[in-house]
Amino acid sequence: MASQDSDEALPANYKDYPDGSLLRVVFHNFLTYEHTSFLPTASLNMILGHNGSGKSSIICGICLACGGSPKSLGRSERIVEYIRHGCTEGYVEIAIADKQKGPQVVRLTIRVGEQPKYRLNDSATTQSEIADLRKHYNIQIDNPCAFLAQDKVKSFSEQSSIELLRNTEKAASADLDQQHIDLMKQREDSTSIEDKCTTSENAIKRLEDEIGKIMPLVENYRKKLALQSKLRLLEKKMKIMEFEKFDREYKAELQNMDGAMIEYREVEKSIAECEKHRKNLEDRIKKDRSQISQMQRSCNEILAKVQEKGDKKLMEDMMQRAKAKLESAKKAADQHEKDVEKARKMIDQARARLQEAVDTLNGYEEFQSEMKSLEQKYSTAERDSRQEEDAIQKKSYEMRQLENKKRDEEQNSQLNRQDRYRVLQNFSSDASKAYRWYQQNRSQFKGDVYMPIMDMVLKTPEAAKALENSVGVRDRTMFVCCYKEDELLINGKQHSWRINTSVVPAEKIYSEDIDAQLPSELSRLGFKYLVSNCFDAPAPLKQFLCNVSGLNRIPFGGSDVEKKIAEVSQAIEQTRYSVFLTANIRCQNSKSRYANNTLQSQSATREANTWRDQFFKVSPVAKRTDNSILEEIQKLKAEIDIRSEQLREKRGAIQKERDVLRQEQMQWKSKKQVHTKWKTELASEMAKLEALENEVVDISAIEEEYANVEKKAILETKKMLENSIRWHKEIIDKHRLIGIFELSESICKSRVNKSNSEAETHRSKLEDLKSVKDAAEDLLKTALNHKKAAASALMKECSLKTLDESKMSPAENKIYSSLVKMFEEADVPTDMNTLDQAITSEKTRLKLAEDSGEDGSIVHEQRLKVLDDDLVLEKTRQEKLIENRARIHDKLGDEINNWRKEVETMIEQINVNYVQFFDSLGCRGEVSLEVPENPLDIEKYGIMIMVCFRKGESMKRLDNKVQSGGERSVATMLYLLALQQLCPVPFRCIDEINQGMDPTNERKVFDIMVGMWNGTTGTLSKTQYFLLSPKLLHGLDMRENVNIVMVNSTLTNSHGKHYDTSAKIDATFAKMGISA
């Protein structure tokens, strides 16, 4: 490199340089340069120098002076590190050609501890202003197609097709690159719409999936609601029919009671009338007796007077009395005959009625006997029912006890798991997160997943310490799976946690490991058990611990072992066991690798830390045997339901039989009452007849007496006629009255007897009616209680106080009308038996629905409504998004098509040059636009380079895994050359692109480059080129426009003065066969 005397020097023909070309480059304390100046030519500048001479420093200085970033150089990203070693300040200065304004001088000054400073034409400026200046001249230092630093050559050849397209656009057309950027922004907007559409589709799918999952629960819930609604409707109808039934029964019993009361009152009235009539007759008898006594006294007085006056009156009186007596006897005899005849007729009538009643009582005794046996049977059945109720209550108590026990065990198990989980959280947050996720997604796993901390149950007091000194810390949170699929599921790449997992399949579980017992010889030495015996765990987990920690081969001993530790160690050495534990010591025997002897190590046991809590001694899961509690509870519940239903049906059947029996009893009782009535009537009439028959009226004796009296009276009358004629009439009258009174008294007495007999008959009848009335009252009370219970049930079920519409309130009328309409619409049975069967059937269907396992609720119903509403809203939103997406895609597709046409035109021009260059090498190559599957994915468009360096082979895509480094360098260089005609940049820099090329290809590429720059047309004839290389081939076609710059590194300034650069170059060119 020639050194200039002045940093202000410019090339002699600098005015001919195209705008943006570099006229001068000055380095001061920059990288390898202390101070130097470099004047490039306007065409090809080949900068040659051995490795480490400072060739790449020129590229770095040009890039930084043009406002570039250190990141684009592939070296240090700290700009202060570009200062020469040992210095605190340095600068780079470049002069840019400009025919109108003159050379534009840009200086970048770098100082340690300060920000870099830029100056333009000796005036302070900013990096952004320098970037604007760079854009003005179209200097593309950030485009590897125009500016390819040494450390970026490899990355350029390895860049993707997408990156190659972007860089090609930057080099060929800023407008095309900006259009690509704008399209990518539009694509991001459309992608956002597509993401929203995808999100909406996923949301719709999620909503539909959730609706699909919840629909069976809602349908089952609706089915149960329908069944419950129908069951309630049937039960309402049953309550109404029961109320109507009991109301009818009550009215019938009330009518029977009224009939019994009427008959009872009539009999009471008859008795009162009889008593009143008897009293009146007795008063009449008393009155008649008083009159008779008075008349008799009067007659006696007259008789006394007659006697005093003469015997005639006495005779007359005697005749009169005899005559009256005769007449009275005749009348009484006539009446007696009539009464006897009447009594006989009444007796015949009573006998006929009694016989009819007797006939109706056929079977009464059998009924009574059957009734007694049935009552005994019903009593026995009721006693059995009460015993069954007691048994059911006992079973219910047992079931509640089991439920309480199960609930307590579940609570204890839950608390145990929570305590263990807290220990796990303190141990490892990732393991706790993974375990919680496993618990929440357990249904996705093929088998169970176990963990020592969560699933081990300690059995002995020393178990915690034994495990602390036997199980590794890493293994304590190990997830032990039964299937490989479960391990991939819990420890897949989709999770953020880092956990330890292992798989122990069922076929790898060996009972001789997990069930190993302490050998008798070790027991004699004082060992208590193997460590694997001090805890319980699921078989896969226990097998895992036996595999990794050898717990089935570690015996645990007490203080006896510690006392004779040497003897025990010697005995252990003879067995297959190498490790044993005591409460305070851990011993291990191992074979020496260098001598055939046993090495023994002892260490103090660590205190229990992980398993020190008491809850590790309790199983976190209910015992297997206790799992039967749920089955027993379900069994007891089913048995209670069945036995309760059977008891209800049994009692219902007995009650129905009792109701039928009571109705039959009432019929028989009515018949019995009729029989009793006529039996009493017959007895009364027969008593009357007997009394009448006992009353004998002897008329003949009275007639004879009368004749004697008459004879005597005639005889005496003749003697006393004159003396007694005056009083005779008076006496006769009085005796007539006396006879009347006596006859009246006799008749009254007879009537009193009759009245007494009738009263007794009525009293007997009243007693019978009283029992009937009492029975009717009991039945009425029973019917009333049934009616009240039915009314209460009616009010509770139907909100109705009565079924009489005239007595209903408007609200009740509305309810009743609604119920009637619902009954008609639901075709509810009107027969109680049919209705009862329907209720039983609906209860069975409801029970089946409740036991189906798909138990829904109002929460699911509400959730379904929310999901349906969300689904409608989401579908509406999706339709709008799809419309927007279609509109945006149409617009974007048109703009992409327009951009694509320009890009394809550009690539076709590149391809023409690229094919031509490869033909000159005797190889094949082509460039094409790589179009993504979705033409709208503008960010996925790229440039695909296909090459073939050997005959007979097909072209393959340029790739760092297929072609060699030299082949990639050739393909990359030719692509850059093919791109030059489309890239109007003022200068280009390529650093060591020929590294890895074979000499033949390197020579051909160089010839192509020289041929292109020797032309007089096209952009290359006006482009400045910097090509850096550590070597130069012999026999290259060097033209006049090729500027060779040699870079040498010197140790001191004086050494440089003695270095004859021109002579060195001439000698080198002569050796290479190049004319200078």
UniProtKB/Swiss-Prot annotation:
Subcellular location: Nucleus; Chromosome
Main location: nucleus
Superkingdom, taxonomy of origin: Eukaryota
Residue span of region Flexible hinge: 416-617
GO molecular function: ATP binding; single-stranded DNA binding
Gene Ontology cellular component terms for the protein in this record: condensed nuclear chromosome; nucleus; Smc5-Smc6 complex
Phenotype caused by lack of the gene: Reduced fecundity and transgenerational sterility. Increased apoptosis in germ cells and hypersensitivity to ultraviolet and ionizing radiation and hydroxyurea-induced replication stress. Increased rad-51 foci in the mitotic and meiotic germline. Chromosome fragmentation defects and unresolved diakinesis chromosomes in meiotic oocytes. Increased accumulation of homologous recombination intermediates during meiosis. Impaired DNA replication in germ cells. Accumulation of brd-1 and rmh-1 on chromosomes in mitotic germ cells.
Biological processes, Gene Ontology terms: DNA replication; double-strand break repair via homologous recombination; meiotic DNA double-strand break processing involved in reciprocal meiotic recombination
InterPro entries, per the entry: P-loop_NTPase (IPR027417), RecF/RecN/SMC_N (IPR003395)
Annotated tissue distribution: Expressed in the germline (at protein level).
Compositionally biased residues, Basic and acidic residues: 375-410
Positions in coiled-coil regions: 190-415, 627-713, 749-786
Keywords (A to Z) from UniProt: ATP-binding, Chromosome, Coiled coil, DNA damage, DNA recombination, DNA repair, DNA replication, Meiosis, Nucleotide-binding, Nucleus
Disordered, as annotated region: 375-420
Chain residues that bind ATP: G49, H50, N51, G52, S53, G54, K55, S56
Domains as described in the record: The flexible hinge domain, which separates the large intramolecular coiled coil regions, allows the heterotypic interaction with the corresponding domain of smc-6, forming a V-shaped heterodimer.
Family statement drawn from the similarity comment of this UniProt entry: Belongs to the SMC family. SMC5 subfamily.
PANTHER family, per database record: STRUCTURAL MAINTENANCE OF CHROMOSOMES PROTEIN 5
Subunit organization: Interacts with smc-6.
Protein's job: Core component of the smc-5/smc-6 complex. Functions in DNA double strand break repair by promoting sister-chromatid homologous recombination during meiosis. Acts in a DNA repair pathway for removal of ionizing radiation- and ultraviolet (UV) radiation-induced DNA lesions that is distinct from classical nucleotide excision repair and the translesion synthesis pathway. Also involved in the recovery of stalled replication forks.
Protein name: Structural maintenance of chromosomes protein 5
Organism in which the protein naturally occurs: Caenorhabditis elegans
